[in-house]
Amino acid sequence: MLKTWERDGYTVEEKHFDYDLHQFDIIKDGETIATITPGSIEEMEETIAALDAGEGVDGWEDGMGNTIRI
């Protein structure tokens, strides 16, 4: 089941990407401003655990070498 995490001013939506590997869209004001693309299932699970723990994504790397700024 894909998840959505609500944060102050934005949401993070998990989406299918490559078989069991998922991406995470960062959506602010109805627009996707960044997409986190984990490099492995382990990284995906770490991302989910961090989001489940309440972490925000500002300052995270998107998996493509870019820093996410909210």
State where each predicted segment sits:
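Short N-terminal "domain-start" leader segments
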Residues: 1-21
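Short aromatic-glycine-(Arg/Gly/Cys) micro-motifs in beta-strand/loop hairpins
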Residues: 16-32
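Mixed-charge, Lys/Arg-enriched low-complexity segments
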Residues: 31-70
